[in-house]
């Protein structure tokens, strides 16, 4: 990515998000809040759009490196530039999926991007092989959150996610694993930042 002068910031357009998606006519997920003001264009004293700081648009490189190390032998090593490359790719991927999900919300005149929108976007953009395992994880997560609310009645920060994932979104019985073309069952692995263990889904925890 290119830098503007000596600034360490990166413009949102470099993430593959067009100006239309930053404006109020579309809906985007903001890193800090979802108020109406944060969804509009911001102007600084020079009249230019507010830039995102790199630490706001990138996942911690330590987490990225940890995921990468899971895919290589224990004796393998990963160069710094490879980690940074994947770190940027992750942000590009998030922007790519979210923009498609945002378009669906705009067409349906909704302002909240939910789990079903993300799954729809992934399927539309050609990531069909990921949709079924993610449906499984989201249903398990929703059931676990309902169980917690039934026991303690506590309201958590993830309540919005569990409420958005309605029963209509998961009407079909989900498999415990994927069935490959040769009839063999394939285990499902889901990467998550969730602190809790959900039965039936193998998890890799991030710090």
Swiss-Prot record:
Q: Which UniProt keywords apply?
A: Activator, DNA-binding, Isopeptide bond, Nucleus, Transcription, Transcription regulation, Ubl conjugation
Q: Name one Pfam family in it.
A: CBFD_NFYB_HMF
Q: Which Gene3D superfamilies match?
A: Histone, subunit A
Please outline how this chain is modified post-translation.
Monoubiquitination at Lys-140 plays an important role in transcriptional activation by allowing the deposition of histone H3 methylations as well as histone H2B monoubiquitination at 'Lys-121'.
Q: Where is this region: A domain?
A: 1-52
Where this protein primarily resides, as one coarse class?
A: nucleus
Subunit composition?
A: Heterotrimeric transcription factor composed of three components, NF-YA, NF-YB and NF-YC. NF-YB and NF-YC must interact and dimerize for NF-YA association and DNA binding. Interacts with C1QBP.
Q: What's the protein called, per UniProt?
A: Nuclear transcription factor Y subunit beta
> What is the source species?
Bos taurus
What lineage does UniProt assign to this protein's organism?
Eukaryota, Metazoa, Chordata, Craniata, Vertebrata
């Amino acid at each position: 990515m290119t830098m503007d002068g000596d600034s360490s910031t990166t413009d949102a357009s470099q993430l593959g998000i067009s100006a239309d998606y930053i404006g109020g006519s579309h809906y985007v997920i903001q890193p800090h809040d979802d108020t109406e003001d944060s969804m509009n264009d911001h102007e600084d004293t020079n009249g230019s759009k507010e830039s995102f700081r790199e630490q706001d648009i990138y996942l911690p490189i330590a987490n990225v490196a940890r995921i990468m190390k899971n895919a290589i032998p224990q004796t393998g090593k990963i160069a710094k530039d490879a980690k940074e490359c994947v770190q940027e790719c992750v942000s590009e991927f998030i922007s790519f999926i979210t923009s498609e999900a945002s378009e669906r919300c705009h067409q349906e005149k909704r302002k909240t991007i939910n789990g079903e929108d993300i799954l729809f976007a992934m399927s539309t953009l050609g990531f069909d092989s990921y949709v079924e395992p993610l449906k499984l994880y989201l249903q398990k997560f929703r059931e676990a959150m309902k169980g917690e609310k039934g026991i303690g009645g506590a309201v958590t920060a993830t309540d919005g996610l569990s409420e958005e994932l309605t029963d209509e979104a998961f009407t079909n019985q989900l498999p415990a694993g994927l069935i490959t073309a040769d009839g063999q069952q394939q285990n499902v692995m889901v990467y998550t930042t969730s602190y809790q263990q959900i039965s039936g889904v193998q998890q890799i925890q991030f710090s």
